[in-house]
Amino acid sequence: MKTIEVDDELYSYIASHTKHIGESASDILRRMLKFSAASQPAAPVTKEVRVASPAIVEAKPVKTIKDKVRAMRELLLSDEYAEQKRAVNRFMLLLSTLYSLDAQAFAEATESLHGRTRVYFAADEQTLLKNGNQTKPKHVPGTPYWVITNTNTGRKCSMIEHIMQSMQFPAELIEKVCGTI
C-alpha cells in the first residue's frame, strides 16, 4: 500500500465522503471515482517526458488533531455507537477508533497506563491473566491489543481519558466522550 500527502482542504473533502467508521481512504476514493479493484487501467499513453531531477516525496499519513476530533465526534453520533447497550461495548469501540486514528500515539499512551497492581493493556491475553484471573481480558478489535474489562465504568473512563489526553484531544471532547461510556 502506498501513502500520499494531500493538503488539508482535499483531505477534508475526501473525509466528508466517509460512509462508515473505519472506512479506508482507498475505499472512499474508489467509491467516489466509481473505480473497482478489478477494473483495469485504460491503455497506457506513452509520451516521453524529461524530468530534471526525480521528485522524491516522502508520503506520510497526515491526521491533524482537527481530523481526529471530527472522527471522534462522528463516532459519538454514529448509529453503531448509539446501538451499544453495554458500557464495555462502547469502551471497546472507543479503543478501536482511537487506535485507528493514531496507532503510535495509542501505543505510547497504553504503555504508561497501568494500575498499582494491574496491567490494563497487553499484546496477549496471558499477560493480563497473569495479573489476575478475574480480569476478563478482551481483544480490542482492529488492534494488536488486549484490555482488561472487569473494571467499573469510572475506571474505563479514566483509561479513555488518559489515552485521549496523551493523544492531545481537547478537554471538552474528552469529557463528552467519557460522559457517553
From Swiss-Prot:
GO terms for biological process: negative regulation of DNA-templated DNA replication initiation; nucleoid organization; regulation of DNA-templated transcription; response to radiation; sister chromatid cohesion. It is found in: Cytoplasm. Changing R155A: Strongly reduced DNA binding. Residues 87-88, 116-120, 150-156 are annotated as: Interaction with DNA. GO terms for cellular component: cytosol; protein-containing complex; SeqA-DNA complex. The keyword DNA-binding applies. Its main location: cytoplasm. Gene3D superfamilies: Met repressor-like, Replication modulator SeqA, C-terminal DNA-binding domain. Changing T151A: Reduced DNA binding. Keywords: Cytoplasm, DNA replication inhibitor, DNA-binding. Changing K156A: Strongly reduced DNA binding. Changing T149A: Strongly reduced DNA binding. GO terms for molecular function: DNA replication origin binding; double-stranded methylated DNA binding; hemi-methylated DNA-binding; identical protein binding; protein homodimerization activity. It comes from the Bacteria. It holds the Pfam family SeqA. Belongs to the SeqA family. Negative regulator of replication initiation, which contributes to regulation of DNA replication and ensures that replication initiation occurs exactly once per chromosome per cell cycle. Binds to pairs of hemimethylated GATC sequences in the oriC region, thus preventing assembly of replication proteins and re-initiation at newly replicated origins. Repression is relieved when the region becomes fully methylated. Can also bind to hemimethylated GATC sequences outside of oriC region. Binds, with less affinity, to fully methylated GATC sites and affects timing of replication. Homodimer. Polymerizes to form helical filaments. Dimerization is sufficient for DNA-binding, but oligomerization is essential for function. The N-terminal domain is required for multimerization. The C-terminal domain is involved in DNA-binding. NCBIfam families: PRK11187.1 (NF008389). This is Negative modulator of initiation of replication. It comes from Escherichia coli (strain K12).
